[in-house]
Structure formats: structure tokens, C-alpha cells
């Protein structure tokens, strides 16, 4: 009996050590050596203070800042512990009501024209840190007015923060909202 169990126990211990300890430690070591900022969560700092992560969206509610995508996380917006989509299907009346309310709120802030989809829908994770360049461009007038800055200066900040497609073909152009708002604060401090 023991002769039958010994190989199973040996393999269990071996693969637990290999897959549960050796491999994660090796990958962590390589990541820390090659890409330390990314391995540590792409933390964004202002001076010595941590202000967020470039990979996780934040709620910016003041008109002085560009707004992030809506968050789908339950209970509290942008809660990384509750990451996930809404699971509402395209035919869901609740989803249609949420989008209609978001469109109304978007237009109530003085914005006109077509509403970018990412301005009224959440991402699959509910934590997307980026918005489309069009979404950012449509917020320029509101942010410029709230900050008493020339629209052309705010628009230039948006264009400077547009990140192109990866390798020219993967994904869509995007704007990281946290980095844009930090650039906005820095520009406002110099005026």
C-alpha cells in the first residue's frame, strides 16, 4: 500500500514546492530585476507621497479634474477588492437605465455632442484607469472653466497625455486619468 502512495506523495510535495514556491519566487525575482516599477504595482507618487497606481482607476468627482470611467465595483467605487464587471447583459433594463442616467449626468454638466461610450459604461474590471482621447477632449471646456485656465492649455495637456496603440496596432489610443490630472495640477501651479 505504501509503495503505491509514496510516488503520489512525492509528486505532490515536489510540484507544490516547484509551482508554489520556486516558480513564484523566480518570477518575482526576474520582475523585480527587469521591471521593478511595474512589479511593484506601477505606483504613482507626487513628491514622497503615493497618489495612486497607473493601473487602477480612481474617482475624480470635482469639475477641476477629468472624470474617470464609471466604476462597476460594488459598494464603493474603484474598490480593487471588488473588481469585476456588472454581469448585466445588453438586453438588461437595469443596464439601459444606468446608461441613460449616466448620459443625462454627462449632458447636465454642459457637454454636448455624442457621448463617448467609455464615459457612460464601465470596463470589464470596473477599475480601468484610462479613458479615450475623445472622452478627455469633451471634458476640456468643463475642466478649463472650473480651473479658470485657457481651453487651449488644457487641450494641449490632453494631447500630451494621449498614449498610442501598443506597437501601433494593439488596443486603442488612451489617456491615463491620474497622470492627466497630475499634469493639470502641475500646469495650474505654474500659472
From Swiss-Prot:
Organism for this UniProt entry: Allorhizobium ampelinum (strain ATCC BAA-846 / DSM 112012 / S4) (Agrobacterium vitis (strain S4))
Transmembrane segments: 13-35
Location of the region described as Disordered in the Swiss-Prot/TrEMBL record: 112-132
Listed InterPro entries: KdpC
Compartments where found: Cell inner membrane
Superkingdom of origin organism: Bacteria
Protein name: Potassium-transporting ATPase KdpC subunit
Bilayer topology: Single-pass membrane protein
Entry's Gene Ontology cellular component terms: plasma membrane
One Pfam match: KdpC
Free-text function comment from the UniProt entry: Part of the high-affinity ATP-driven potassium transport (or Kdp) system, which catalyzes the hydrolysis of ATP coupled with the electrogenic transport of potassium into the cytoplasm. This subunit acts as a catalytic chaperone that increases the ATP-binding affinity of the ATP-hydrolyzing subunit KdpB by the formation of a transient KdpB/KdpC/ATP ternary complex.
Keyword tags: ATP-binding, Cell inner membrane, Cell membrane, Ion transport, Membrane, Nucleotide-binding, Potassium, Potassium transport, Transmembrane, Transmembrane helix, Transport
Quaternary structure, from the entry: The system is composed of three essential subunits: KdpA, KdpB and KdpC.
Homology family: Belongs to the KdpC family.
GO MF term (any one): ATP binding
Amino acid at each position: 500500500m505504501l509503495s503505491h502512495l509514496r510516488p503520489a506523495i512525492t509528486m505532490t510535495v515536489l510540484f507544490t514546492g516547484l509551482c508554489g514556491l520556486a516558480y513564484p519566487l523566480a518570477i518575482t525575482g526576474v520582475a523585480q530585476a527587469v521591471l521593478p516599477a511595474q512589479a511593484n504595482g506601477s505606483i504613482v507618487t507626487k513628491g514622497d507621497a503615493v497618489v495612486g497606481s497607473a493601473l487602477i482607476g480612481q474617482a475624480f468627482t470635482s469639475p477641476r479634474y477629468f472624470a474617470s470611467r464609471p466604476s462597476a465595483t460594488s459598494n464603493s467605487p474603484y474598490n480593487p477588492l471588488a473588481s469585476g464587471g456588472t454581469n448585466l447583459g445588453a438586453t438588461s433594463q437595469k443596464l439601459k437605465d444606468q446608461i441613460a442616467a449616466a448620459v443625462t449626468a454627462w449632458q447636465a454638466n454642459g457637454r454636448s455632442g455624442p457621448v463617448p461610450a467609455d464615459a457612460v459604461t464601465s470596463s470589464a474590471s470596473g477599475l480601468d484607469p484610462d479613458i479615450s482621447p475623445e472622452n478627455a477632449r469633451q471634458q476640456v471646456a468643463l475642466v478649463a472653466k472650473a480651473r479658470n485656465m485657457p481651453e487651449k492649455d488644457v487641450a494641449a495637456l490632453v494631447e500630451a497625455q494621449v498614449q498610442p496603440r501598443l506597437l501601433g496596432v494593439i488596443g486603442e489610443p488612451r489617456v491615463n486619468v491620474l497622470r492627466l490630472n497630475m499634469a493639470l495640477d502641475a500646469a495650474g501651479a505654474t500659472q
